[in-house]
Curated annotation (Swiss-Prot):
Recorded GO MF terms: glucosamine-6-phosphate deaminase activity; identical protein binding
Protein name: Glucosamine-6-phosphate deaminase
Protein family: Belongs to the glucosamine/galactosamine-6-phosphate isomerase family. NagB subfamily.
Gene (name only): nagB
Catalytic machinery residues: 67, 137, 139, 144
Keyword set includes Oxidoreductase: no
Uppermost EC category: hydrolase
EC number: 3.5.99.6
Pathway: Amino-sugar metabolism; N-acetylneuraminate degradation; D-fructose 6-phosphate from N-acetylneuraminate: step 5/5
GO biological process: carbohydrate metabolic process; glucosamine catabolic process; N-acetylglucosamine catabolic process; N-acetylneuraminate catabolic process
SUPFAM superfamilies per record: NagB/RpiA/CoA transferase-like (SSF100950)
Hydrolase found in the keyword field: yes
């Protein structure tokens, strides 16, 4: 497990955007595993700028997002469909819509949707890079503490701490979805390379536990100890207090 310290979120986001660009230049049919949330808000605009500046053809690039809220239509302002299109997909015309994969959280049969998404992941292949954030309680994706390390894509109940953390994006806490369709920990671990980003004081304890604690299901991110190619990128706020 490699630890990379970059001064702040901007420099870290630039670094990740460049890593993604290098991958696609080397492998035009790359598979990207993408995350959402506040951690990634600078990564995708910078990545988009680099794609445009380098005139990269994205027609054969596949993307898989980690998760989507249950109950939100794709067009909802706080859906992860909207997030990804606003920050990335709408800015580069060569993205192939058929190759953009995000779970559907608004369908009637959510269990069927979870199975469909997991099967699609397995059929298309291992992500070359999987981006991750980390929750204050150590969750990755929406895999909350206690999630089985063998878990695959499924419907998950969000914890109170996750709902509270996500409430900043909604008008009222009652509007925050209580469930999501999320890739499982086993799904995530199939990626060839994993890059986890964490910024700010609120994420310091989770990173400290990840780096110094045991591998067990009470800290979902600790499964990353078992992966051969993980890079954890942190800012000075975290690194200087580890």
């Amino acid at each position: 497990m490699k630890i990379t310290n970059l001064v702040d979120k901007k420099l870290a986001s630039d670094y990740v955007a460049i890593e993604l660009l290098k991958l696609i230049k080397d492998k035009p049919d790359a598979i990207l595993g993408l995350a959402t949330g506040g951690t990634m808000t600078d990564v995708y605009p910078r990545f988009s700028e680099l794609l445009s500046a380098n005139h990269v053809d994205l027609a054969n690039v596949q993307t898989f997002n980690l998760d989507e809220y249950v109950g939100l239509e794709p067009e909802h302002a706080q859906s992860y469909h909207t997030y990804m299109h606003q920050l990335l997909f709408d800015h580069n015309a060569s993205w192939n819509a058929d190759n953009i994969h995000i779970p559907q959280g608004h369908v009637d049969d959510l269990e069927r949707e979870a199975r469909r998404y997991e099967n699609q992941l397995k059929q298309i292949g291992q992500p070359d890079i999987q981006l991750l954030g980390i929750g204050e309680n150590g969750h990755i994706g929406f895999n909350e503490p206690g999630t089985s390390f063998e878990s695959e894509t499924r419907v998950v109940d969000l914890t109170e701490s996750t709902i509270n953390a996500n409430s900043v994006h909604f008008d009222h806490i009652d509007d925050v979805p209580k469930q999501a369709v999320s890739m499982g920990l086993n799904s995530i671990m199939r990626a060839k390379r994993i890059i986890l980003l964490a910024f700010g004081e609120r994420k310091r304890d989770a990173i400290h536990q990840l780096l110094n604690g045991e591998t067990n299901e009470s800290l979902p991110a600790s499964i990353l100890h078992q992966h051969p190619n993980v890079e954890i990128i942190v800012d000075d706020t975290i690194f200087n207090r580890l």
